[in-house]
Structures are given as C-alpha cells and as structure tokens.
C-alpha cells in the first residue's frame, strides 16, 4: 500500500495492490500482449522476470502512462530493476506461504566507494502449494553488475530458474448447464508421474548513455528461453448431466521456446520558453521460436468425479514437434511535450513489420503469414485547475494474442498478433494527501476461442467498454487506503460460422471487480500496522454457448467477495532492522472457480495464512 500511487496495480515482492496485474488489465493481459517494459525498454520475455532482479511492477494506463512513449492499447507492464546500491548490505527473507509452502531468499548489495561499480544479486528457493493440492518447487539465481561512469549506466544481468518439481493443476471441463461444487480442499486429483520439469533463463543488458547535454541513448537486449523437459495436462470432463467424468492426460515431448528481443532509443530534449520537449526515435525487435505438438493423449475412461483416480505410468511414444518462428520489428518516432501547469501532449507513430512461419513436424509443410501495419498513439492532457486534470487518448497497436490453451488441438501454439485499438479518457482530482481518478475506455481486438473442431483460433471480434476508478492516499495521520473499481461491458461480435453457437459474453471476464487495501498504523509495540483488504469479483461466463435451459443465456459463475486481514511490524533485533508481516487471506473461506478458457475451470484459492520475516544486514 505504501508504494502504490494509484489503485490500478502495483506489485512489490510478494505483495500487490490495485485491480490490475500483468495478467489482467481492463479484461486483457498486457504481458501476453507483449507490452512488457524493463526499465523503460521493450523485452519479449519467456515467463516473467525473476523477483531477485525486480524492484517493483506497475501497470501503466491512463494518467499513469501519460509520459510513456509509444503507449500500448492493452496497457504497459512497467518493471523496475533493483537500482544501484546506496550501501553494501544483505537481506535475508523467510516466508511461510499458503498451505504450508515456504520461500527462502537472500539478496546481496555491493558497491565501491567511488560509486562507479555495483552489484545486486540473489538466490531463492520456493515451494508453492495450491488449493487444488498441486505443488511447485523451484530455485532461482540472479545477478546484475552495474557500471556508472560520467552519467553512463550499463547493467547486464543473468538469471536462471530451475523448476525441479511441478504438479499440473488438475482442470475440470464442463459441458452442461451447471457448475459442479468445488472439490475438497488440498486433495490432489492428479498422478504422481505427471510432474513437470523445466528451466527458464534470462540474460540481458540495459544501458543509458548521455551523448550530449540534450541527447540521450537508452536501450537494451535480452535473451530468454524456456526449456520444457517434461510437461503434462490433466483434466476431468463432466457430461451434461451426472458426476461420472472422463479422465484424460496429455503429455508433451521435450519442447523449446526462446526469444531474442531489444530496443534502442535516441531521446532529444529541448526547451522553448516554459515548454519542455522530447523527440524520440527508436527501433525495437524480437525473434521468437516456439515448439509445439508431438503430444500424446491418454484416456483413462470414466471415473467418479472429485475422487483421485491413480493410474499406472504409461509408455510414451511422442510424435515430431512443430516449429514456429516469429520475427517482428518496428521503427518508431515520438514526441512528448509538457507545459507545466497547463498540460501535455504525447504522440507516437510506428512502422511495424511482422513475419511468421510454422513448420509442421509430421508433414514438413510450412505456412507463413505477414503484416506491415502503421501504428500510432496520441494523448492530450489538460490541467483544468492545479488540482483537476483531464486526458483523452487513443492507441493502435500490433499485440500478441498469447498461446492456445492446453486442451485445444493446436495446444500451446503461438497465436498470431492482432491489431488492437483503444480510446480512453479520464479525470483526476488531487487533494491533500491523495488523488481520485476516474477513466472511461473502449478496447477492440480480434477474439480467439474454440471452433467446432476444437481448434483455438480467431472466431470473431471482442470489445471491452468500461469505467474504472482509483482512490489512493492518506486519510489522517494513521490511515492509508488504495482502492480500485472496474465496471466492464465485454461483448463478442462478428462470430464466424465455423465457431458454432456462441454467446455475446467472452468467457472468464468479470462484469465488475473491486479491490480495497488499507493500512492503519497504531502505537502498539511502537508502530504495529493493521492491514485489511477486500476483493469482489463479479459474474463471469463459463460457457461460450448459451443454453435453452438457462433462457438462452450462457452458463455463469456468481460473484464472490473475499476479505484479507493482517499485521506488519518493524523492529530491531540485535541492531538488525527487521520486518514481520502476517496475513490471513480469504478469512471466511469462500469457495469459487477460476475460468481459464471456455468450459475450463480451475479451483480458486481458499483460506490461507502467510508469514514473512525480512532482516536487512
């Protein structure tokens, strides 16, 4: 809460605030859309940047994106790397997390006396456990040396994550007009032999180089890979009526995903009177290889739903894998102007180039696609009074569409990027100690779902139209609040005949979402802080098709409200500053489902306790 500027999304370490995350902003995923920026530089990263390198993650939309060059329609995920150390030190962290999981962390900070050489590095072991009984264990190692000489800052990094033990979430597939009860907590319905093993490596560099007093170079490169040695999906398919489910497992052969990406910008700053101007010219690129296919499916027949069905490990006979290559680049030109006390302008144009090819591992046939669009962004902001500001903007981008779900015939295939358009505007009121923001937006893009042959492909268009609000600030000397709310109207249109019968609601997208986080500082123990959080997730569609038995409507999940309570205490032990944090999440143990894809359900998390102790040496 203390590190949040608004209620739209901030993550520091294991804690987050706001209604949006890198996986969900205005109903879409800005991370899957390819809108990650690391210290302001574009990267196409497999997975996510390890926490040992990250200082924070913020979702930049609306007013929070007003100074961002080349804004993106689905929003920008801004990740800040750990900065040059102010002093030498070591941080040790011990975390007890949900359902008995644990995390151990050590972070190192070193610098020389001259302030020209620094190092941030870390190691972590994590053992996460989930409400459905699955478990993930991993090791992460990361290091980032930093060189600062005469205003130049260059910071290479290397990070490696080894997932040594990962049980897949066992999914439930519904085909009728009812949703089953959530299975008993912490009963794993999967197999002992479906353990996934994978490696994730990230190597990169960022650089800021002042060329003259007005001209600055900013850029970076990154290599990222995800080496999947073993990968499984397990699910139970429920018939339209009854609770005798079909049990299936899909196994994948070893597959490789890797990406090289980067960006270079030249920024020229000059003034004219009170106006501050920035001209930006740049180039960004990526080249991504994705292997898919060769999978083997196992059908273990019908079993009683929500009871473990242990099967013997079968013999695997995988097929050849498919190989997909995406090459994308853009030349960019932008202008940012600001007149203090009056307003700002942010304009950008990009000439993008997209090329993709996919080689079928079985037939050897190669398919290709291409696009050469012009992209743009334009935002104008006006300071009506010193306390009240307005903004209006539009963006058109070429954004990624993610990958096909595990149950599709084109399982894990990289979906083609799509042209996305957004219009938005908002008002901000700054008051003593805080601010209130209200925005309205509309985003349109192609819609991907299953067709009648179970291929996950484009079947129409989707529009998200909504209003979002954020209230953040200090209310008195003790109370701090970060609150956000979203009212969304998602709609699917222009559905192709090959999609079969489709409803107007995209699956899994809630109509409303509210999150409130608060801190209240007391005088107990010299400053014990009480924390509380509330989350409300509105109704969302489970099925793509409507049912006559439901009055021609789609199968829906009801809204759910959860409450979190916690405490935070800072103290000194033996001269060592320490921070203790305890949280009881979902206090009243509400049960619910998550919708991952049409008719695909996963168990949402239930009541759980976490305890964190951090020492700064």
Where in this protein do the model-derived segments appear?
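A beta-strand signature from Gram-negative outer-membrane beta-barrel systems
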Residues: 5-6, 27, 33, 37-39, ...
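Acidic/polar loop-and-plug regions of large Gram-negative outer-membrane beta-barrel proteins
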Residues: 146-148, 153-208, 225-257, 301-316, ...
């Amino acid at each position: 809460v203390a590190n949040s500027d608004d209620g739209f999304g901030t993550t520091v370490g294991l804690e987050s605030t706001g209604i949006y995350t890198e996986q969900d902003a205005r109903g879409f995923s800005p991370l899957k859309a390819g809108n990650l920026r690391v210290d302001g530089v574009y990267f196409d990263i497999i997975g996510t940047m390890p926490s040992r390198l990250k200082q924070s993650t913020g979702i930049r939309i609306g007013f929070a994106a007003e100074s961002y060059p080349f804004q993106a329609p689905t929003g920008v995920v801004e990740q800040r790397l750990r900065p040059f150390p102010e002093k030498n030190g070591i941080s040790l962290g011990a975390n007890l997390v949900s359902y008995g999981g644990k995390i151990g962390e050590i972070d190192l900070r070193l610098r020389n006396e001259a302030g020209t050489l620094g190092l941030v590095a870390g190691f972590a072991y994590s053992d996460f456990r989930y409400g459905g009984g699955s478990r993930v264990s991993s090791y992460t190692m990361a290091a980032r040396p930093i060189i600062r000489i005469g205003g130049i800052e260059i910071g290479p990094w290397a990070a490696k994550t080894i997932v040594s033990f990962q049980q897949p979430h066992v999914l439930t597939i519904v085909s009728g007009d009812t949703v089953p009860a959530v299975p008993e907590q912490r009963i794993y319905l999967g197999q002992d032999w479906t353990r996934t093993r994978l490696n994730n490596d990230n190597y990169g560099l960022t650089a800021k180089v002042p060329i003259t007093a007005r001209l600055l170079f900013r850029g970076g490169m990154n290599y990222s890979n995800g080496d999947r040695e073993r990968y499984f999906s397990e699910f139970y398919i429920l018939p339209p009526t009854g609770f005798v489910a079909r049990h299936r497992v899909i196994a994948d052969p070893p597959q490789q995903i890797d990406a090289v990406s980067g960006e270079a910008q030249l920024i020229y700053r000059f003034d004219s009177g009170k106006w501050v101007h920035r001209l930006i010219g740049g180039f960004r690129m990526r080249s991504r290889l994705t292997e898919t296919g060769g999978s083997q499916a196992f059908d273990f027949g019908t079993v009683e739903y929500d009871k473990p069905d242990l099967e013997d490990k079968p013999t695997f006979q995988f097929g050849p894998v498919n190989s997909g290559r995406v090459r994308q680049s853009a030349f960019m030109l932008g202008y940012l102007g600001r007149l203090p006390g009056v307003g700002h302008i942010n304009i950008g144009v990009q000439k993008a180039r997209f090329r993709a090819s996919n080689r079928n591992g079985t037939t050897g046939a190669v398919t290709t696609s291409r696009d050469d669009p012009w992209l743009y962004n334009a935002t104008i902001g006006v300071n009506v009074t010193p306390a009240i500001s307005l903004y209006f903007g539009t963006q058109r981008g070429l954004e990624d569409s993610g990958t096909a779900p595990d149950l599709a015939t084109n399982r894990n295939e990289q979906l083609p990027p799509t042209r996305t358009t957004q219009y938005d505007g908002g008002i901000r009121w700054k008051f003593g100690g805080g601010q209130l923001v209200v925005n309205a937006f509309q985003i349109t893009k192609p819609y991907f779902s299953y067709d009648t042959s179970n291929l996950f492909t484009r079947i129409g268009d989707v529009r998200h139209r909504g209003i979002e609000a954020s209230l953040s600030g200090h209310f008195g000397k003790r109370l701090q609040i970060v609150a956000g709310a979203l009212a969304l109207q998602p709609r699917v249109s222009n559905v192709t005949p090959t999609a079969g019968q489709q409803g107007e609601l995209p699956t899994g997208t809630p109509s409303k979402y509210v999150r409130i986080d608060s801190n209240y500082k007391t005088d107990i123990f010299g400053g014990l802080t009480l924390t509380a959080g509330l989350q409300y997730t509105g109704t969302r569609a489970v099925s793509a098709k409507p049912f006559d038995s439901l009055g021609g409507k789609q199968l829906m999940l009801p809204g759910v409200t959860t409450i979190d309570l916690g405490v935070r205490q800072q103290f000194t032990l033996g001269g060592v500053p320490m921070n203790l944090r305890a949280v009881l999440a979902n206090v009243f143990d509400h049960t619910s489902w998550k919708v991952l894809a049409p008719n695909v359900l996963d168990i949402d998390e239930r009541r759980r306790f976490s305890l964190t102790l951090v020492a700064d040496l």
